[in-house]
């Protein structure tokens, strides 16, 4: 089973979801901004993805700066509390598969988590090619 913690307003998140679906998977899609987070859920995801609250913090287009979360003196516990209160603070998308858990930025990171890929070609919304016409990953 594949789970994607998704924000439909995010181009990277949309690209990752489309890539997963184009590969033939039917992921469980969790719109985390609507559903929110729990501390245990975030701690589990961060541990599995080798992230910390600070490294998973969305610093742009979020209230991180106005909440003073970008200061070096802010602890991971404080960031985690803020993430539970303001789900948009968590960077996205986070994808879970039997191969692991990753913050999939850039979009092509998700390929490392899939057993099979779209047959190709596959391009991001902006036209950047991720998989060529032969089904091979494009490295830029």
From Swiss-Prot:
The active site is at residue 10. Its EC number is 1.20.4.1. The record marks 6, 58, 92, 105 as: Important for activity. It comes from the Bacteria. Keywords: Oxidoreductase, Plasmid. InterPro entries: Arsenate_reductase, Arsenate_reductase-like, Thioredoxin-like_sf. One of its GO terms (biological process) is response to arsenic-containing substance. CDD domains: ArsC_ArsC. The keyword Manganese does not apply. It catalyses: [glutaredoxin]-dithiol + arsenate + glutathione + H(+) = glutathionyl-S-S-[glutaredoxin] + arsenite + H2O. The keyword Lipoprotein does not apply. One of its GO terms (molecular function) is arsenate reductase (glutaredoxin) activity. Belongs to the ArsC family. Catalyzes the reduction of arsenate [As(V)] to arsenite [As(III)]. Does not constitute the major arsenate reductase in cells: essential only in the absence of ArsC (AC P74313). This is Arsenate reductase ArsI2.
């Amino acid at each position: 089973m594949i789970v994607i913690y998704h924000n439909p307003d995010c181009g990277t998140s949309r690209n990752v979801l489309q890539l997963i679906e184009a590969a033939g998977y039917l992921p469980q899609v969790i719109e985390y901004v609507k559903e929110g987070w729990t501390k245990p859920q975030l701690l589990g995801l961060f541990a599995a993805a080798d992230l910390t609250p600070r490294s998973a913090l969305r610093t742009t287009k979020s209230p991180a700066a106005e909440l003073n979360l970008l200061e070096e003196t802010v602890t991971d516990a404080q960031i985690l509390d803020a993430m539970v209160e303001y789900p948009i603070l968590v960077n996205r998308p986070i994808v879970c598969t039997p191969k692991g858990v990753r913050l999939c930025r850039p979009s092509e990171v998700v390929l490392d988590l899939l057993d099979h890929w779209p047959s190709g070609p596959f391009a991001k919304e902006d036209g950047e090619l991720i998989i060529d016409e032969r089904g091979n990953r494009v490295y830029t």
